[in-house]
Structures are given as structure tokens and as C-alpha cells.
Amino acid sequence: GADFVFHCAANTSGAAVMARTPLVHVTPNVVMNTYLLEAAYEASVKKFIFISSGAAYPPTGDRPVEEEEMFNGDPEDVYFPVAWMKRYSEILCRTYATKLSVPMSTLVIRPSNIYGAYDKFDFDTSHVTAALIRRVVERHNPFEVWGTGEDIRDLIFIEDFIDGLMLAVKKCNFYDEMNICSGVGVTIKQILQTALLVDHFDNAHVQFNPDKPSTTPVRLMDNSRLKERLGFQPKISLSEGLGRAIQWYRKHPFAN
């Protein structure tokens, strides 16, 4: 049997779909997560790694949220159904690790906004960074950005995320929870300006549309546990990461 199961699959979409159909991701993900945990347990898997989400946290404003704060309050309304789906799946992970006579070690990973190669670039299902990257590569002009551009996110490049993930798998045992993030907040406007700069899209006429759906104004995550317990620090800067992601998508324009 398998020593490790990395449960990275999820039914996801962007802000527009979530605004139209708030419950669309609840049932598919709850069913999938429940069956995968059950199958892993029956197969005597040594460690089950569940990729949760930083969006499940309660709002903490401009203060980075820490791991132990997950259940300190309700998640934000815009994420409410999806966030509680993630929280329920985390509780299932904790149950398998701590409430059974024969436990299965589980690890809950809460990433910030991951970006890079093999992301979802379809506008209906992509998150904001991938959508911006696609518009940059396709040279949209005028360049429409949903929202005001002032929303703040924590971005982590996919290779940094994987490095942090593998370190957590190696060093965390029994049951644990870990934020994997950069610990640095950037605005959507800064992400866009960096992407335009690294790809030399100098004549872009950017139009911010505050009437279009967006999610939360600020989402920051604390990476102290990641640094102190695992000795991990992301290596890829925003400009390097966006440059590499843009080049990847340019070579794979149908990867939507």
C-alpha cells in the first residue's frame, strides 16, 4: 500500500461563480474528502496530507492569521459555504488521527494563494493571479481588473509551496496543522504592475471595475510556525515567480 496520500484535488472556481452559486463546491468536495480519508484509512496509509485553505480562517483584518485561530469565529461571508466545507474536512482529519483506537497520522496544510505552472487559467475557474497572467500574455487592452485593485493577498510560488510541503511531511507527525505562505501581503494592483513590468507590457490601459465580483479585502497568513519549526523560508520573489509563470503559460496557452 501507499505510505503517503497527498489530497490536493478540489472542486474550485473564481469569484464570479462563487457569487452566483455559493453552494456549488460544498457537496462535491465533502463527498470526495470523506471517501478519500476512508479509503486511505482502510488501506493502512501511514500519513494523509490534506490541502485545506487559508480562506477558511475567520477574518483578522491586516493581522496575519495563525494556525490555532481557525475555529475562533465564523469565516468571511463570501467564503462561508466553502470555508465550512474545508473546516469539516479538517475535523475529519483530526478525528482519524486522534479519536480512533488505531489512528492514522494526518497533516492539514493551509496554503496561501499558490501560483505558477499548471495553474487553472480558465477565467471561470481561475483565481486572481492566474487570470491576470493570462490577460498579460494575451495582451488584453484595455486591461480590465475586477475590483479596486486594493485587495491584499499572500502569494507563494508553486515550487516554494512544494518545498515547504515536503518538509512538513518529513517533520510533522501524528496530527498537525501548518500554514505554507510567504508571510508577505501584496495588493492586486502590485501583482498586476509586477506582471506588466516583467513581461514588458508597457502600453496596457488598466481599468479597475469595482462593480465586478471580488472576494475579501485582506487575507494575510502568519508563517512563524513554518519558519521556527521547519526552518523554511520561501526563495522565489514575486517578480521571478510571475516571470516564470508568464513564460510557462505563454508556452502552454491551451492549459485552461
Residue ranges of model-derived segments:
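NAD(P)H-binding glycine-rich loop region in Rossmannoid oxidoreductase-like domains
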Residues: 1-29, 39-42
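Active-site beta-alpha turn of Rossmann-fold NAD(P)-dependent dehydrogenases/reductases
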Residues: 9-10, 49-53, 110-112, 149, ...
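Short beta->alpha connector loops of Rossmann-like oxidoreductase domains
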Residues: 12-14, 57-58, 116
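NAD(P)-dependent short-chain dehydrogenase/reductase
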Residues: 61-64, 68, 91-170, 183-185, ...
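Active-site helix of classical SDR
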Residues: 81, 85-88
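C-terminal substrate-binding subdomain of Rossmann-fold SDR/epimerase-dehydratase oxidoreductases
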Residues: 138-256
